[in-house]
Regions:
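Beta-strand-rich, non-transmembrane domain signature
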Residues: 21-214
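Bacterial Sec-dependent N-terminal signal peptides
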Residues: 1-26
Length: 214
């Protein structure tokens, strides 16, 4: 038997004191179909609850599962869609993901795989998709304990939607990384799922004053 836990934060602009709701807030329905941004998302030009936002997360979804091959591993997948609203938001197309990869090979390892991404731009009334090339992906040694996955989404400017996906494999299945329901950018939709085998028991702790559906 497996246990499924879902943490879900929907339309966090209604919850967060950092991004207060305005009286005339106009929101768009979250579109969770990865690879298929909606017309409303493509035409979005500003974010009413925080008009200073350079970009917003349209969604960030995560899913963790346990696999077994000569021992348990924990896998965590990320699916992200971000709308660039202002020129200074272009920097969010450069993504860095640190992960544990000690030089001592006798220790447990983490690795990143299944990395993909693309950008979407409206040109002459048509949605133009530009996939990320493999040469835009790199792995850098940060120190003797960590590596950093780095990649840059192409053809990004004001108005662009970027999407990316990656998967982390970890030998440290006894430790589940924290999941941040809110980031420095406004978050329209955030969801994390984990399926836990019945042989494992974890303590789940929610932090923050706002209610999160579990």
């Amino acid at each position: 038997m497996r246990k499924l836990f879902i943490l879900c934060a929907f339309l966090l602009q209604f919850l967060s004191p950092v991004y207060p709701q305005q009286a005339t807030t106009a929101t768009i329905e979250p579109n969770l179909k990865y690879g298929k941004p909606s017309k409303e998302e493509l035409s979005l030009t500003s974010y009413a609850p925080d008009t200073t936002a350079a970009a917003i997360y349209l969604f960030h979804q995560g899913q963790s599962d346990f696999i077994y091959h000569d021992g348990f591993q924990l896998t965590t997948e990320h699916w992200v869609r971000i709308k660039i609203l202002k020129p200074q938001g272009v920097s969010y197309a450069d993504v860095s993901v640190p992960y544990y990869s000690p030089t001592d090979k006798d220790e447990g390892q983490e690795r990143a795989s299944e990395i993909e991404g693309c950008s979407y731009n409206m040109e002459n009334g048509k949605c133009i998709k530009t996939p990320m090339k493999r040469e835009s992906i790199s792995f850098e040694r940060f120190n003797n304990l960590y590596k950093i996955l780095k990649f840059s989404l192409p053809a990004v400017k004001e108005g662009t939607i970027i999407e990316y996906h990656y998967k982390l494999y970890s030998d440290y299945f006894s430790h589940i990384d924290n999941w941040m329901m809110q980031e420095e950018l406004p978050m329209l939709y955030n969801q994390y799922k984990i399926t836990i085998p019945h042989v494992f028991v974890y303590n789940i702790e929610l932090r923050g004053k706002d209610y999160i559906q579990v």
